[in-house]
Amino acid sequence: DIAQRIDMRAPLEGGNFLAIMSQMAREAQQGALAWAKGGLAACHGMDLVIAGIGGVFIGIALAEKLRLPLLQAYYIPFTPTRAYPSFLFPRLPPWFGGALNRLSYQLARQMMWQGFRSADGLARRDVLGLPSASFWGPFNAECLQYYPILYGFSPSVIPRPPDWDGNMHVTGYWF
């Protein structure tokens, strides 16, 4: 279990940002290989890959390898919108407006992607036999097109953005 292997106490207690990032990169690379191998075995005979925010990159790679559709499922908004800023990005003042709200999603996605990019490339090459994803990320991968994205939150708590298309579905909480 990767959670048991990660010992981040020393880097965190030391407060050294570079040491923290270096440790996380090493753990992500080791984890990515295990996740790709386990995911490949788990997907044998499946018709669909489902991935959320923590596994979206390996989910995309598995869907590409197996030529399966990918259903994205998230607990927080992950699709860019002008309605409000990304929950993964520092809070923006309300006067920043819609364009910067939308940009905050792109920036949050890029921060996630760049942190995981080398691990994803390793898993794609060594386990899945795939080429590396784009420097900018796999967000335009074919397996992401045309399929619904499910959001497990209440529209009474987080309103469905009016600029999302018909593929985005706010379903209410998942318990």
PLM feature segments, named:
Residues 1-175:
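Nucleotide-sugar-dependent glycosyltransferase catalytic domains
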